[in-house]
């Protein structure tokens, strides 16, 4: 999981982390699952950016949708 910090003009600092969410039905639900799971342990989530979408395929059938999400949250010292 890659992380980096970003500073804004107000002096606040935000950390960006990368997550992969999965779903059996859609990329949108996969992204939502990633954000929901992150919200259980991270505070002050700010922006989620979908950076990549793919599917797991077996025998010609889609088994799972995956969404890679860059998620920013306020960095607390």
Model-derived segments and spans:
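N-terminal, polar/charged subdomain of small-to-medium soluble alpha/beta proteins
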Residues: 2-77
């Amino acid at each position: 999981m890659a992380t980096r910090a970003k500073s804004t003009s107000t002096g606040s600092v935000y950390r960006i982390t990368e997550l992969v969410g999965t779903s059996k039905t859609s990329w949108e639900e996969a992204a939502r699952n990633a954000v929901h799971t992150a919200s259980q342990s991270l505070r002050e989530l700010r922006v989620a950016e979908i950076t990549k979408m793919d599917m797991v395929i077996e025998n010609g059938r889609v088994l799972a949708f995956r969404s890679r999400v860059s998620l920013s949250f306020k960095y607390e010292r």
